[in-house]
Amino acid sequence: MLDVILIGGGHNALAAAAYLARAGLRTIVLERRELLGGACVTEELWPGFKISRAAYVAGLLRPALVEELGLLRRGLKLLPRRPSSYTPDANGPGLLLGPDEAASLAQIRHYSPRDAERYPQYERVIDRAARVIEPLLDAPPFDPAHPRLSDLAPLLRALRAGIGLRSDITAALSLVLGSAVNGITSWFESEPLRSTLATDALIGAHAGPSTPGTGYVLFHHLMGDTGGARGVWAYVEGGMGALSEALADAAREAGAEIRTNAEVTRIGVRAGRACAVELADGTALEARAIVSGADPARTLALLGREHAPADWAQGIEALDFRSPVMKINLALDSLPVFPSCPDAREPGPWHQGTIHLGASTLAELDTSFAAAERGELPERPMIELTLPSAVDPTLAPKGKYVASLFVQHVPPTAKAEFWEKNRERFADRVLACIDELSPGFSGRVLHRDVLAPPDIERVFGLTGGNIFHGAMTLDRLGPLRPIPGWARYATPLPGLFLCGAGTHPGGGVMGACGRNAARVIEKALRGRA
């Protein structure tokens, strides 16, 4: 009999498989699609154009995982984005921000000398606060109802870092626990800087910058430290699927078996214990532990409510899986131009990182959210444009480019019929917004792939199209994720575990959920839980 069956071949499940197999456990990964990675994939949608179709940047990837699994020697190459963001401005120089502090301050100073003076202190608070949280990312969450000695080490490291905050602690708490608007406006006065920073608070969240709790989402996305530089995110050479392939290589080398085109349709239960899975082709497999890399709602559906403890099932059903996200993938025949680069023949600094378009003020970001909340499509959505082939030319034919548009806010409860009428129409609106600051952009598009929330759910198996496997609100973090009492990757059904982004520490391509879950599962199977 197998020791472990992992449902889904997403990056967290692949990470868990590698650790479990390295521990000597007989492990198999079952992925329903023909390629591995879940939402962390590269797809050649059009000849010569390699697209990171869902997840599109790295930066939260845990350094311990990279080192322990030897991902760099397995071909993983992270390409830091320097600068990291560009906000075009038709009436000004635009705003380039990145790890070069002097260059960033010079850009900010165009809009506000006061903001340029305060920005280094803001960065310092973010860095110090991140040092408090980081030890907690790499360990199962502390459960106050059932404390363990093993919880003490990460808590003590976090406490030591917290003491280091000293006079910054009030500012850090205000940023992390409040709304993005309250946090950002207490620091800065210039609208380009305010709105640029606020977008990180909204990624994947059905919220506007004024929504309480968005400060944590902002902070979550600022914890990236590619190459040891805080806030620096990276592209993966070859697309995001190259990361998943490196993880799969580590798992296979350790002895794990990985199958694609192997869709799990049911989790089997015998004598009150999860012990098997059934595949779409009728194959049945048994194991001592069934580990789901799917989101909690999808896991419950595979289990069947009749086999789930009632309180746990009710908690999972109450989770918020709404998604305001549309993903548009493009093939371009040439580089886009912007006010700062009216003649873009070669990639410049403006093309390296995230380009902020569409809603350009805090008020417009709130208006975009309000439209989606009413079930409508916003006139000026939030648009984040990235051009990974400007940094990684292996992704497109010579002289051509791939682009990714991460778009919010779309109505999260809109049905398939709504999207049949509005999917392409809204994509046209998005391109028209880009044309305002990048003349002729829409005319450069050779191909496009438009994914509304129902499409993201259908293709990638994410309930509601939610990229985080459930909202990252303050009441769904740490010992409360996915639900109170069941945050340490186990479920109340013996033999069934979770390892996806619906568990601590949450969404983003970091691999921590899989790594942490593997530690818990190994101990459980060896009788050391």
Label each PLM-derived region with a short phrase.
Residues 235-237, 256, 263-396:
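Mid-domain catalytic core of redox enzymes
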